[in-house]
Amino acid sequence: MSNDYIEHYGTKRHSGRYPYGSGEDPYQHEGWSWLARDKKLKEQGFTEKERATMLGCENTSDYRNVKSRYVNEVKAGQIARAKYLVNEKKNTPAKAAEIMGIPLSTLKSYLEPDRENRVNLTQHTAELIKEQVDKDKYVDVGRGTNINLGVTPERLKKAISQLENEGYKVQYVQINQMGTNHKTSIKVLTKDDVDYNTLKDNKYKISTLGGNKIVDENGEIVSTKTEPLKSISSKRIAIRYAEDGGTEKDGIIELRRGVDDISLGKAKYAQVRIAVDGTHYLKGMALYSDNLPDGVDIMFNTNKHKDTPKMDVLKKLKDDPDNPFGATIKGEEDLKMTQRYYTDKNGKRQLSCINVVNEEGDWNSWSKNLASQFLSKQSPVLAKKQLDLDYAEKRAQLDEINSLTNPTIKKKLLESFANDCDSAAVHLKAAALPGQKTHVILPFSSLKDNEIYAPNYQDGTEVVLVRYPHGGVFEIPRLTVNNRKKEPKSVIGNATDAVGINSKVAEQLSGADFDGDTAVVIPLSAGVKIRTSDRLPGLVNFDPKEAYPYREGMKVMTPRYKQIQMGVVSNLITDMTLKGATDKELERAVRHSMVVIDAEKHKLDYTQSKKDNNIDELRRIYQDGGGASTIISRAKSEIKVPARKEFYGISSINTDPKTGKRIITETGEEYVKTKKNKDGTEEKENVKVTQKITAMESVDDAYKLVSSGNYKIEQVYAEYANEMKSLANEARKSYLKTGNLKYSPSARKTYSEEVDSLNKKLKKALSNAPLERQAQLLANQIVDAKLAANPDMDDEHIKKIKGSALITARARVGASKQRIELTDKEWEAIQAGAISENILSSIIDNSDLDSIKKRATPRGADTNLSNAKIALIKSMSSRYTIAEIAERAGVSSSTVTKYLNA
């Protein structure tokens, strides 16, 4: 039999010479046939479950969807036939009813004007969804999306089932849930040719039904996209090139004071993007200047030379109306000091030309930890002190969680704590040093090479600066605070999170520029000693932008590849330092790292840099030709393992109750790999499906990742990682031993009003689920961008930016997530067991966790501290202030004083 065939394109209702359903034999259609078989099986006594299996359905739910679809299809056919017989064949209704063999009343109902629309609602819903999937490729069809279409959840389910039968498919993708350590699972409808990896790579392109639009209170569909950019004319901009001193302020945007459309509001500085002529944009740190030439409102400083045309100095806007700058900008609702809108001289509200990425105050809480790429290059004694302090803090946290009285809340926090400790073992970040803060760096030529303007520190204080990625002690400037300098004082005054340095100091910070680069400032004292050294000779006056400029035909580095290569070269430098590389060898690696840092931003020729600095040779010598070779670099490096089953949460299925260790279960999945031989023949073999995990995740004992050199600093980090693994296991064991909340029917009756109130609050919190998922997607995108800009951000700040990003995202997509606020009486009802554990779990997910935790903590716990917390306070007493200890321990300053004097 031939496999050739002619495929018919069209739809059942719209193709063919005669209307769908107008044929003489109603059983010619598959719907009639299927329903007839179902009816016959039912008459023979088969149950619904048995009929589902016999008719090829996956389960009873699938059976009901198929049946509903065919019932609608048959009914639509009957309506079409009734209209055809009456309107086209000119039969009387009575005659048409006779021909069709149905009662006259039924036929008349078929002729009602909106009857066809009502019957075809599933079909119309399916067509609307199909249209959006064809346009957007990835569409969220999860809980609540039916509201956007004005249909019931059941109708939506049936429409999706119909589309699945037409070749579309439902897939699930998970994203991080902002504010918790949980995942949000998004149900996505795609075409059949979209595999899971493609969906995962494009998760930020998932749209919600309605096409990223929401329905307002009047039923009108309104866009949730950001307002179009307002551009400034290039005629108002001047360029200060390298020959005129632009290099010393590279990345600084000087603004004329008092000009409304470029005002910074109450802020003295901000990291901004400014659209120019609708085609280009400026990016950098904006400051006010009182020394601009007449007719110039903006002066942009660059290290480019005078032969570069003005518009080539600027960057081209990206062809993406939702993200033209390639960076997340703040909306008006997020700004505290920097202007977004202004009122013009006619009293009208106008959009500012200033688009803010970070404003004054945003950098204040960054990097309250010490990354291993810095601390591992310091003394093992200092590293151990800071890692021990981090362990002491986590030990105290676990004791506090174990003291909680509500089992559901306790388990939530134990699970989150275990995940945090597993992550800490991988990332190896230590506690911050006293007075340590991240600041954005700004240039002031009046400062000497050994001076810093730092209003957060006292005059005369000696400090060091650390910038990431960190190459070595030769990249750490040692400076003295001078807050008396007029120039920085007049420009940034008492800046909350900015410091002033000159361009020579910036060069030592691995070639930092001033478009928003940051540095960690660490004050030195008798208890804090940081190793530093002079710059390596081969790095003096090295400018990666001058040494490796763009050349025609070269491969341009992508943002993703930049992150990979930064990790590769950072690991190489770490391993070289531990293994005693020479200064000349370190110069080569660090020069290449400086090129990699700026390669994507300035389109640098990183492949030529790799050749010139012979990076492959360094990897052969210090990494055995492979990748990471010490625990510092190996911990986060990825390895492939057989694919594992994903279990979410903690249970006896995925956790050993005796040890608390995770139980690894392989999926056993395989695929056929075809190998072509030289003679043209093919060989096929079954190969296990793999997945990537970090090396630290793959071992129970961190010492297995220590190099053959067994360096002292490696031992310090291995010990810390094992302590984190032990705490995680302890938390999981405690979770499994913690019982469930006992539900009490009598308590439900006693607290019936409170139960009703809690259910209403929860229903309201869950009512905008689709928009909340869109907000979670957008928030993840914002956080990813922030983490890419500051990969060594500490957990505390990551938590803060997640919260901030979610607020921004909710406002942007129109989601109105409402936190549930509990009354004392409602809490009493919860403690009495008036609601189920599942309901309480949902309430916790939609409440302020700190507030819930406070209610669940035994009275007096804030003053009668655990032994672990007392030990934490005393371990910090010799180097930290009372205020710093109180902040880290989560207690008042008076409580700290009480225990230190005990």
What spans do the regions from the language model cover?
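Charged, low-complexity interaction regions
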Residues: 44-46, 91, 580
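Beta-strand-enriched accessory nucleic-acid recognition/scaffold domains that flank the catalytic cores
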Residues: 37, 72-84, 88, 116-491, ...
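Short acidic, low-complexity intrinsically disordered linear motifs used
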Residues: 2-23
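Short linear, low-complexity motifs centered on an aromatic residue
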Residues: 17-35, 610-611
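A short beta-strand element within the Helicase C-terminal
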Residues: 517-521
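Short alpha-helical "recognition helix" segments of helix-turn-helix
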Residues: 49-55, 93-100, 144-146, 884-887
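Key DNA-contacting residues within the recognition helix of helix-turn-helix
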Residues: 63-64, 108-109, 157, 897-898
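Short coil turns linking two alpha-helices in DNA-binding domains
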Residues: 58-62, 103-106, 152-156, 892
